[in-house]
């Protein structure tokens, strides 16, 4: 609503927006903003997730504004990592910064930007704070197609490198299929490992490739002693929480938005 000047219904929880809604950014009639349902993952298990995922995968937007609740960043990390795998220019908007301030918290923005390799903009949609900066960053990354850095969160040295080897083996196995299906290979590999049937159908693997995929996944499961049907990106989440991004969340420090560090 702040971007387009519309009065659509908004809320704090996923599912409020049932379908996509389009509008132009105020003062910039040559732009198009598509409001998609709020979700916490790109898994196709709810109508909201299906609407959002189909749009992002099939309509190839020039940029994404990923709006995250700044009071509960960790809950949105999984979706953020999935979006980064799509190789689409993205800006991370930390909304509800007014509540962060009121609760005596601070977020070190430059550490998040360094960790994720994308612009991070603190905003308060309710108080119209940071919206102009958000629009400027979004238009810039869309115009110049500045895509997220390719970050391998699960590096070869983490926990024996089982997830790293699994993902890269699957990427090598499915690369040609993913390109033909128009799906970014890292996103396709992680979702295939997690048993995403819609992605597997689009990849059109032959029987031998399906058996190789299953073998790779079982090998990783045996090395890590867990089931990959839990989100494979759990590894990424653990690393992020141990990283500078986790360290950037420091309660009871900032007293005003001017103290939110860049």
What do the PLM-derived regions correspond to, one by one?
Residues 1, 113, 139, 171, ...:
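Residue-level preference for well-ordered alpha-helical positions
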Residues 28, 51-121:
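Conserved C-terminal guanine-recognition region of P-loop GTPase G domains, centered on the G4
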Residues 99-155:
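Canonical P-loop GTPase G-domain recognition
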Residues 14-21, 32, 44, 48-51, ...:
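Helical mechanochemical/support elements of P-loop NTPase systems and associated helical scaffolds
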Residues 117, 144, 150-262:
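Extended helical scaffolds that flank P-loop GTPase cores
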Residues 1-44, 58-59:
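Conserved G1/Walker A P-loop phosphate-binding module
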Residues 6, 15, 38-39, 70-74, ...:
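Conserved nucleotide-binding/hydrolysis micro-motifs of P-loop NTPases
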Residues 3-4, 56, 68, 138, ...:
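Hydrophobic aliphatic residues
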């Amino acid at each position: 609503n702040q971007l387009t000047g519309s009065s659509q219904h908004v809320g704090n929880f996923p599912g409020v927006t049932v379908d996509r809604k389009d509008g132009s950014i105020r003062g910039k009639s040559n732009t198009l903003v598509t409001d998609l349902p709020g979700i916490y993952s790109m898994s196709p298990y709810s109508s909201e997730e299906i609407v959002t995922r189909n749009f992002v995968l099939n309509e190839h937007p020039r940029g994404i504004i990923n709006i995250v609740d700044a009071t509960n960043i960790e809950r949105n990390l999984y979706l953020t990592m999935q979006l980064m795998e799509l190789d689409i220019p993205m800006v991370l908007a930390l909304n509800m910064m007014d509540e962060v301030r009121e609760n005596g918290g601070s977020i070190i923005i430059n550490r998040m930007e360094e960790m994720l390799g994308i612009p991070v903009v603190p905003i308060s949609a309710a108080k119209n704070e940071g919206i102009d900066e958000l629009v400027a960053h979004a238009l810039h990354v869309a115009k110049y197609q500045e895509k997220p850095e390719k970050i391998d969160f699960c590096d070869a040295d983490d926990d024996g490198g089982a997830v790293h080897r699994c993902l890269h083996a699957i990427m090598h196995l499915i690369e040609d299929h993913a390109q033909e299906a128009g799906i970014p290979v890292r996103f396709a590999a992680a979702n295939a490992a997690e048993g995403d049937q819609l992605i597997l159908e689009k990849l059109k693997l032959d029987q031998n490739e399906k058996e190789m995929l299953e073998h790779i996944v079982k090998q990783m499961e045996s090395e890590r002693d867990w089931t990959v049907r839990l989100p494979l990106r759990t590894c990424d989440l653990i690393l992020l929480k141990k990283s500078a991004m986790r360290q950037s969340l420091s309660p009871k420090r900032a007293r005003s938005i001017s103290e939110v560090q860049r």
